[in-house]
A protein has these predicted regions:
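N-terminal hydrophobic/helix-forming segments and targeting peptides
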Residues: 1-115
Length: 116
């Protein structure tokens, strides 16, 4: 694999392995801010938590380029823990009920501790 292709692939793997269920995108935002900061003059966070970078140019005719992606992913929220220790969950986003049983999940506590 060429060096550039490998760098791009590694970045894709990095971002897709970060946890970012809707409303809990802080891990993705933090990683993106860290990677974006050295490439731009300023990083701005909007009111919804989205990030964008601005790189100023002395050339008024310089092209304007935008790369866009969403940071969140579908997940679940625990709504109940039964007396037998079973977790009752509600979906956050759209899950395919036929494939969800084959997925791996990471459980985050209210204080942010992860349990795989």
């Amino acid at each position: 694999m060429k060096i550039l292709e490998e760098r791009i692939w590694n970045r894709i793997v990095k971002y897709t392995e970060l946890q970012g269920t809707s409303g809990q995108e802080h891990f993705v935002r933090q990683a993106f801010r860290q990677d974006l900061s050295p490439l731009v003059d300023e990083v701005v966070q909007n009111g919804l938590g989205g990030l964008y970078g601005i790189r100023h140019s002395q050339d008024a005719t310089a092209p304007r380029i935008m790369f866009d992606a969403h940071m969140d992913e579908v997940g679940f929220v625990v709504t109940q823990i039964t007396s037998r220790g079973m977790l009752v969950v509600a979906p956050v986003g759209g899950w395919n009920p036929y494939t969800v049983s084959a997925e791996r999940f990471t459980l985050f506590t209210q204080i942010g501790r992860a349990h795989v």
